[in-house]
């Protein structure tokens, strides 16, 4: 919760600051995507952008990514080579530690824009899914927090009920 409070408080006070990326790893059905889309999206006032196409697949377009304060990489296909992992890890490090991000949209002028958002990665805990984890060398270790969900099976209410509960309770979390 400290990660979220730090990001939200600075965002709310219009004093943006850089912060850590987080990785949420756990079995299917634990609410990782729900947390990213509904809790973080609700707190920050905008649904997280799907950064997988840009950060993992390598598409150059970032206009949709910088449009949201949260970049989400959710159950993305695993990285298949050491070179891809190194590139992904370097990009993640850059987005976490730099105040500027390249802006690139089709048929528009490119440039750099300020971005103080957060990167959130969600993955399952099978060996294939965990291949999305960035390198945790010395330069990245302080920039990324890793969290693992419990293996306890959770029974969520119906989707509409869950979303209604989150909408009702979210103001008290903020």
Indicate residue ranges for each PLM-predicted region.
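Alpha-helical scaffold elements adjacent to nucleotide-binding pockets in ATP/GTP-utilizing enzyme cores
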Residues: 35-39, 87-95, 139-143
